[in-house]
From Swiss-Prot:
Chain positions recorded as Mg(2+) binding sites: S112, D251, D253, D255
Active site: residue positions: S112 (phosphoserine intermediate)
Chemical reaction(s) catalysed: alpha-D-glucosamine 1-phosphate = D-glucosamine 6-phosphate
Cofactor binding note: Binds 1 Mg(2+) ion per subunit.
Gene Ontology CC terms: cytosol
Modification Phosphoserine occurs at: S112
Source organism of the structure: Bordetella pertussis (strain Tohama I / ATCC BAA-589 / NCTC 13251)
Superkingdom, natural source: Bacteria
Record carries keyword Metal-binding: yes
Gene name, Swiss-Prot/TrEMBL: glmM
Top-level taxonomy: Bacteria, Pseudomonadati, Pseudomonadota, Betaproteobacteria, Burkholderiales
Protein name: Phosphoglucosamine mutase
GO MF term list: magnesium ion binding; phosphoglucosamine mutase activity; phosphomannomutase activity
Family statement: Belongs to the phosphohexose mutase family.
Function: Catalyzes the conversion of glucosamine-6-phosphate to glucosamine-1-phosphate.
Length: 452
């Protein structure tokens, strides 16, 4: 894929009022996307169905969402696209609505786990997946072309969806087995003052759980602030205080999950992915699981021991999904809590992932700690080393020798990951080993080889 001017790996994202997250750019982006979608519609029209393409726009709870929604709507309408406004719904809800309503595309206004000062815009294809690269490239090229407007008789219409949240709630519930319920289970659900504030608590309540909800009072400014999947310690405190069985933490757009048990222990994405896969193995063979460069070595070892393949993708759920599709595997995820179950949904979904974990626990009549007890997470040690200007760490002889020595010493007892920071001139030296002391000593050997 060629270098992009505006789009990153997850759409367009930045600070509100910056070069790309402003009303003027959103208007141009909406018009550009509309033109491309209209052209695709004409080229693939079969003579049946809608006269005009339709898209759905969903958003999280940031104050800037109103501005960006209105600008996108105007641009799309000017290009002759009908718009459905779903309001505040999780990112995976937009993927679901796009697919089930047979729409041309879905648009999400969210910066996920970032603070309210940021926002972003990303697209889903008609199949509820990421846009094909050629369509994304065409939209980006069209952004820099002059704004225009179709004739009055061809303008798109916009309307608010009254049932978007209800549709999504029912979809989430449909991924939980009909022969199970959550009766007698006491949950604390933290929606991060984000997109799931009005849907996630309903999902678990309607399946029978007693739910205490936190992070469900968005004011436009408090999304992800001290709550949600980025701050599970807040949830852990609430779970202990209320004597709950489990806690469920989502992030601002509800595609990320962390969980907490009744003791306050926090479970990250690696542990939750294992909980899901272990249950799926009782239904039939699981060919493999995709993690990332940051997935704990303990998960890789445990999956190998139970006969499940494992591959690492670059960090980012987009790359995890790409590798899952390439291999035909159904399960994957990140330590951060992006979990993908392609037998349930086309994209990562925190609420649905939590339901799959709960399915495992109900089937086994086990606690979360009991269910993942055979997964041994390896201690991790990371040292950040400043990179001197002009230093090519990939060809550094001292580092190469140190890495070879460390990897020989670890041999099946851990792993080494060396990568440059994407945001600052630093080299990240990470070692996972079967005990803390070995991880620390190994990471220090790598740092010493660079004179750190």
């Amino acid at each position: 894929m060629s270098q992009r001017k505006y789009f990153g790996t997850d759409g367009v994202r930045g600070e509100v009022g910056g070069p790309v997250i402003n009303a003027a750019f959103a208007l141009r982006l909406g018009y550009a996307a509309g033109r491309v979608l209209a052209r695709e519609h004409r080229e693939h029209a079969s003579g049946r169905g809608r006269n005009r393409p339709q898209v759905v726009i969903g958003k999280d709870t940031r104050i800037s969402g109103y501005m960006l929604e209105s600008a996108l709507e105007a641009g799309l309408s000017a290009a002759g696209i009908d718009v459905l406004l779903a309001g505040p719904v999780p990112t995976p809800a937009v993927a679901y609505l796009t697919r089930t309503l047979r729409l041309a595309a879905g648009i999400v206004i969210s910066a996920s786990h970032n603070p309210y000062q940021d926002n972003g815009i990303k697209f889903f294809s008609a199949h509820g997946m990421k846009l094909p690269d050629d369509i994304e490239a065409a939209i980006e090229q069209a952004v820099d072309e002059p704004l225009g407007c179709v004739g009055s008789e061809e303008l798109g219409r916009a309307r608010r969806m009254a049932d978007a949240q209800g549709r999504y709630i029912e979809f989430c519930k449909s991924t939980f087995p009909h022969d199970l319920d959550l009766n007698g289970l006491k949950l604390v659900v933290d929606a991060a003052h984000g997109a799931a504030y009005n849907v996630a608590p309903h999902v678990f309540r309607e399946l029978g759980a007693e739910v205490h909800a936190i992070g469900v009072s968005p004011d436009g400014f408090n999304i992800n602030k001290g709550v949600g999947a980025l701050h599970p310690e807040s949830l852990a405190e609430e779970v202990r205080a209320r004597g709950a069985d489990l806690g469920i933490a989502l992030d601002g757009d509800a595609d990320r999950l962390q969980m907490v048990d009744g003791t306050g222990r926090i479970y990250n994405g690696d542990e939750l992915l294992y909980a899901i896969v272990r249950e799926r193995m009782q239904r039939g063979p699981v060919a493999g699981v995709v993690g990332t460069l940051m997935t704990n070595y303990g998960l890789e070892r445990q999956l190998q021991q139970i006969g499940v393949g494992f591959e690492r993708a670059n960090v980012g759920d987009r790359y995890v999904l790409e590798q899952m599709q390439a291999r035909g595997w159904l399960y994957g995820g990140e330590s951060s809590g992006h979990l993908l179950c392609l037998d349930c949904h086309t994209t990562g979904d925190g609420t649905i992932a939590a339901l799959q974990v709960l399915t495992a626990l109900r089937r086994a009549d086990a606690t979360l700690a009991e269910w993942v007890a055979d997964l041994r997470m390896y201690p991790q040690r990371m040292i950040n080393v400043p990179l001197a200007p002009g230093l090519d760490w990939k060809t550094h002889d001292g580092l190469a020798r140190a890495r070879g020595a460390v990897e020989a010493e670890l041999a099946g007892r851990g792993r080494v990951l060396i990568r440059a920071s994407g945001t600052e001139p630093k080299l990240r030296l990470m070692v996972e080993a079967e005990d803390e002391a070995l991880a620390q000593a190994s990471a220090q050997k790598l740092a010493d080889s660079l004179g750190a």
